Amino acid sequence: HTPGHTEGSVCLLARETGLLFSGDTLFAGGWGRVDLPGGSAEAMVESLERLARFEDGIAALPGHGRSTTIGASRPWLDAVVAARSLEI
């Protein structure tokens, strides 16, 4: 459960294949919108903090756009975690 974009947002991790289906939580270069009904910047920060714990080699397949990896997302993920805010 990775709320933030919406209350019911989820990400699915297939550890055996190293694939993270990140939905509308994590995209190449950023995160999903939080200005929709049920969206929450605070919940998104908490969700991104959980995803930031994954290994850099995990491939993220978002609901839109191109794929990325946790490692490629590390600079902005670490900034969000350090600030505990999407205002980075």
Residue ranges and their predicted role:
Residues H1, T6-I88:
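Metallo-beta-lactamase
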